């Protein structure tokens, strides 16, 4: 494969010497652009008709089409134009007939009609089409743009996919060290700037470094001169074995090749790019879903804040949604198993009828219901697996038994270990109707599967004869399996049936890295989606997921990813969330922040941290809510903050300056609703880690701790939070807590406090609370307790019941720089 890459780069260098000269065999004109093609088969200029600017790099013409034979790219040498078609001759004397048509005065439709001398040709490549544009490179949508002009390509069928053939057929991406202005790279990595690094699993690592950039696809790629836009189509009609994600994978034959591959090429003002894609969808029969009569890409509030509820009280789900003013509720997994997708579960014992009744009830309250599936993951207890496994389960490859086995033998001899050395999570193989698990494969002949578990997942252990076929099953990361290409289509149809029957409004296709495990790349992933979408009775479904690719761009409403709530809120995948906003912006996608969980310990400042980021990026998010929120004494304030912030966000009244400040996760804000369409916005300062604990002091010396709080705002009543934390003595207590402000005003808390208690001041009163902010005691706060502008001296003292009594951890709070926001 390294050799292939070298060949490919060499070809790109050669293109620099294919001078276009001054004459063109064809000049194609659309409303906004002119495409100039020479008699060698190269696009030499893409001109913005408004200002005459050429967006192709000088001396770098782009081939209309290339051929790929598995080792090298075969370039065009001549192009002949006849009416609505081109005949392109290549270096190997192959001739391609490409139809061309300007449609809606907006784009050029190109389609491969035929190819001669094609026996050795494995794939064709559209382009790559080189541009000088580098500001926004849409690796998924296939559009590059700056603030003025956009150039893009859309694949017009599912077997035309993003990328270039020598890099495979997935929407491959990568991580690079490439700091943005103001970001610092560690000294030991400074020589790696601009270079690719190993993939980062943010769920395992917790986050990604801020100086790392992630690219999620290859429909468009960054180049020194700007960018390339690139698409391909492959001949799938012959079975082959490839190296795929660390394993050997048999790619089964499928009756599809590159004849008929088609693209739409366009160049328009940047502000028109999304609209042109909409025209292409309608003209070419691509998915064009509407929600409430509006196209998903331009509808208002296309990326809402919404809720996940996985509890059993579905009435609570609707009530919590009303409390947040959310109109979309994700209720999680509703399936008995993945595969057959049976709907009879403990939450919905009566299946379809019960789910439909609930979605109707929600709809009457203005709420859509969404559900979750891991796309093509197949449960081990599904009927496709147990008790008789389907022959349509995906396999990586096969061998044969070289020795007869009984139903109790635990070592199994096989002819070849080729497909069995990649163990995966379940290490499973299928012999006839029995699934066996194995611990390892011996490295020398006779090759054996060692320590086998017979009759895995409820299948029946059996005797097997020498010469019987043994298949290595493909495992997913949930220890289940995958369907083959044909069965995946059945899955797509079944999930459409579920949508049609139940009235759900959102389908969350989680785990789409399982979309094409069979090696059929984006085509296989797109086949599943097309089956689902085509079989929907109504196309007004919201769909989302975590791994978008080009075809899915047309269908999906927004990107969704989850479970990053295991860490402290303000450290929970923050860089990853921000990096995704850059991805959305360059790919004409609505912003989303991912998942959060409404914890029973949250304060208003915590939920407002989420809301400020949502408003900054105009990004939705998913908020997981369950009955634990009932334990939160500040619950009503949390819900009020969510409602107010989302109302402000959707009003689009924030200035660019305000939004830029909010994009910095280190900045805190408070929003105060003052009317039906008016708010006060405050900047907020929180200073934490002011810890007062027991220590030895000299006789007569007071046991106190001194802190300095720098208030950047005007004078104001003292506000703070305090957490009483473990000091080692679980039965220990503190009492007579006093907080002295600037040597004059004393705040006294006469209550006895223990580990888990919390205290706070809102400037008017002092509240003693349990661990979840439920008020136990309330005391008035002295009116003389004020934060002065600038540095404030704070002294804290109390009585400790023992040297290991609890400690007091204080967080000082101030707000200011009020800005009034009002709509009409």
What are these regions (language model features)?
Residues 294-398, 474-497, 502-526:
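Aromatic-lined carbohydrate-binding/catalytic grooves of carbohydrate-active enzymes
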Residues 454-462, 466, 709-824:
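Intrinsically disordered, low-complexity segments enriched in serine, threonine, and glycine
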Residues 355-371, 377-379, 392-399, 613, ...:
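Carbohydrate-binding surfaces of carbohydrate-active enzymes
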Residues 27-329, 361, 368-369, 505-506, ...:
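Carbohydrate-recognition beta-sandwich/jelly-roll modules
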Residues 375-461:
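Autoprocessing Asn-cyclization modules and mimics
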Residues 17-25:
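Bacterial Sec-dependent signal peptides at the C-terminal "C-region" and cleavage site
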Residues 269-289, 322-330, 354-397, 466, ...:
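Glycine-rich, aromatic-flanked loop segments that form ligand/cofactor-binding clefts
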Residues 380, 384-398, 473-490, 533-633:
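Glycan-recognition surfaces
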